[in-house]
């Protein structure tokens, strides 16, 4: 049925002179789906980075944990956890009709979590020499996520891939900043793991010739 539907749409588009647009749209959908698992895994790793900042609070009783989560480290941990979940959700939405627009919303949401309203603002409140650098790095992650969301809105694999590459680079810079702050160091490794997966997804979308193609099982 799906093949028949594409044939009918192709014939209609050829009649109206829009066959190029149709081919581009179909190709974009397939390309985005190829990067789906990298986004889901990368988002999951970033979510674990947030969990690393919340690990101490999770071992406390309810009242003590509630107070710890309200501290700058806890607020940043919750924000990073929510941002990672939103990035993973963006990858999952590629499966559905209209999924690229929904994925763009999710990526924009992740940018809000990293930006000045939550993560960056909380990091700036930490009383540590490297806290200001970490806050600036979080803002850079938010900016890169915004560019990625724009690429998704435009259904542009190249722009989305470039955006994800920028997100990966800024996540690594954030991890470097976290290494300099003892309170944040526990989250650095997971941020780097997430950056690696997002970079792989960006390479798929950007059409990096060095990116190995995965063989799909043959259907009979």
Ranges and model annotations:
Residues 2-20:
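N-terminal chloroplast transit peptides
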Residues 24-220:
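N-terminal plastid-targeting presequences
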């Amino acid at each position: 049925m799906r093949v028949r539907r594409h044939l009918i749409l192709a014939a209609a588009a050829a009649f109206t002179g829009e066959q190029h647009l149709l081919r581009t749209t179909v190709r974009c959908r397939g390309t985005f789906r190829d990067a789906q698992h990298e986004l889901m895994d990368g988002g999951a790793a970033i979510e674990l980075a947030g969990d690393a900042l919340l690990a101490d609070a999770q071992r406390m009783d309810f009242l003590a944990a509630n107070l710890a989560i309200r501290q700058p480290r806890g607020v940043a941990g919750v924000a990073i956890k929510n941002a990672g979940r939103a990035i993973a959700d963006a990858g999952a939405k590629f499966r559905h009709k209209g999924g690229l627009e929904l994925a763009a919303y999710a990526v924009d949401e992740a940018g809000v979590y990293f930006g000045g309203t939550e993560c960056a603002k909380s990091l700036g409140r930490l009383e540590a020499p490297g806290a200001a650098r970490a806050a600036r790095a979080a803002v850079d992650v938010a900016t890169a996520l915004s560019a990625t969301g724009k690429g998704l809105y435009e259904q542009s694999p190249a722009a989305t891939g470039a955006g994800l590459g920028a997100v990966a680079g800024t996540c690594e810079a954030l991890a470097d900043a976290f290494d300099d702050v003892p309170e944040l160091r526990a989250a650095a490794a997971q941020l780097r793991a997430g950056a690696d997966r997002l970079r792989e997804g960006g390479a798929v979308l950007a059409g990096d010739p060095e990116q190995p193609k995965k063989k799909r099982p043959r259907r009979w």
